[in-house]
């Protein structure tokens, strides 16, 4: 078990270059981190191939940590298990990563869970053989576009990590594709990722060769397949946001039709709760909404200065009774057991005269079962298989009426989803 964090920052060097390059890098790094004015420890990972580098590091007072796996996956695993710092900075020790950038990483340590030295954002730059540049650009372009990611340099290994975000992912897959895996998993947990410009100059000797491209490509292909499943899973922090902006016309229409109906029901009400908000864009359309979700990753993703977000459960809403004019619960109850506590909790938080807005799919129609079957074929990692309670319009109307609510409006989306607005009379 890894000890609790003690050092503020661990600077982990890997892939050492020539002896004189390593000597200069260590000297520069030691001087630079001294200005951080916090406890800082330098480490060198040892994969067993460079005993001379280990000797240089120890002579300079650098701690050496064993690296069990190969590639950057092995480096990251060694960094997590072999250090105790709250922040971890990784950089290659062959001269391609300028240590002078370290203060810039440190200045952004609280801004994101991962800070990347990026070659492919404005003011970033790279100097490398043309074929490496083409391969690197293509790799990053495919991952960015196909996985719908907001960052540009997924293969840069010059990074700062917050241990709190990195440690739960360890051990990561060995190999260089671990860089993409860690980055995407962190983003899918709702953590922030920040890129800062870096100028990258490839070393004259060493590095990639044509002979390494095939095994590297196979590693990246395997990683891409895993990350494709994750990015299109409900486990991804931005699942609802991606659906709102989907490239699939029908999915985009459905999401935006729901958004229009719900925002119309809310109107100009100021005290509004969205119980089970996920990463809905309704929070941007109606910024007065208090968003609550059981999934912490969704709450993290939707954080904005001034926004009111709560990590909580629909079975025990963490709010006072009669705290809201409108309580909204959309696309939630079908994922939960049919428990009367859910309805009583939602109604408890509404003022007399306020309204409950409840949305779910309608299993009483023929349209939704057909849509669900087709959706399951097209997107097997989507929501459909998680619907454990099947409601119909008749069941919901009867349930809400029996609880003292008056049905005011009912809207449908393609006859497959029902959205009800019901008034709390007393």
Label each region the model flagged.
Residues 68-82, 87, 99-172, 176, ...:
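Acceptor/aglycone-binding surface of glycosyltransferases and processive sugar-polymer synthases
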């Amino acid at each position: 078990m890894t000890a609790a964090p003690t050092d503020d920052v661990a600077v982990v060097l890997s892939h050492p270059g020539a002896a004189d390059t390593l000597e200069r890098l260590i000297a520069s790094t030691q001087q630079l981190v001294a200005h951080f004015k916090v406890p800082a420890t330098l480490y060198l990972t040892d994969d067993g191939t460079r005993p001379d580098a280990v000797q240089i590091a120890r002579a300079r007072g650098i701690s050496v940590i064993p690296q069990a796996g190969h590639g950057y996956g092995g480096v990251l695993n060694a960094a997590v298990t072999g250090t105790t710092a709250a922040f971890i900075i990784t950089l290659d020790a062959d001269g391609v990563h300028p240590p002078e950038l370290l203060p810039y990483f440190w200045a952004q340590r609280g801004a994101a869970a991962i800070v990347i030295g990026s070659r492919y954002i404005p003011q970033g730059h790279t100097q490398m053989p043309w074929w490496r540049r083409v391969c690197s650009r293509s790799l990053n372009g495919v991952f960015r576009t196909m996985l719908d990611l907001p960052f540009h340099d997924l293969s840069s290994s010059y990074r700062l990590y917050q241990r709190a975000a990195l440690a739960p992912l360890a051990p990561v897959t060995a190999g260089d594709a671990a860089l993409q895996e860690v980055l995407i998993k962190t983003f899918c947990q709702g953590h922030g990722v920040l890129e800062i410009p870096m100028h990258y100059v490839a070393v004259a000797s060493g590095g990639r060769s044509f002979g390494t491209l095939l095994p590297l490509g196979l590693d990246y292909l395997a990683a891409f397949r895993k990350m494709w499943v994750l990015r299109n899973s409900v486990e991804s922090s931005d699942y609802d946001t991606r659906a709102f902006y989907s490239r699939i016309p029908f999915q985009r229409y459905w999401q935006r039709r729901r958004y229009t109906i719900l925002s119309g029901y809310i109107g100009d009400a100021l005290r509004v709760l969205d119980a089970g908000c996920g990463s809905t864009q309704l929070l941007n359309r109606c910024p007065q909404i208090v968003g609550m979700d059981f999934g912490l990753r969704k709450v993290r993703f939707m954080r904005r200065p001034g926004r009111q977000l709560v990590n909580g459960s629909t079975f025990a809403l963490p709010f006072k009774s009669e705290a809201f004019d409108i309580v909204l619960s959309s696309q939630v109850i079908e994922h939960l057991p049919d428990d009367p506590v859910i309805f009583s909790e939602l109604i408890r938080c509404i003022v007399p005269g306020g309204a409950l807005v409840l949305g779910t799919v309608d299993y009483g129609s023929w349209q939704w079962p057909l849509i669900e079957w087709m959706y399951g074929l097209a997107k097997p990692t989507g929501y459909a298989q998680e619907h454990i309670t099947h409601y119909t319009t008749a069941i919901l109307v009867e349930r809400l009426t029996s609880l003292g609510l008056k049905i005011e409006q009912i809207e449908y989306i393609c006859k497959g989803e029902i959205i009800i607005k019901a008034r709390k009379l007393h």
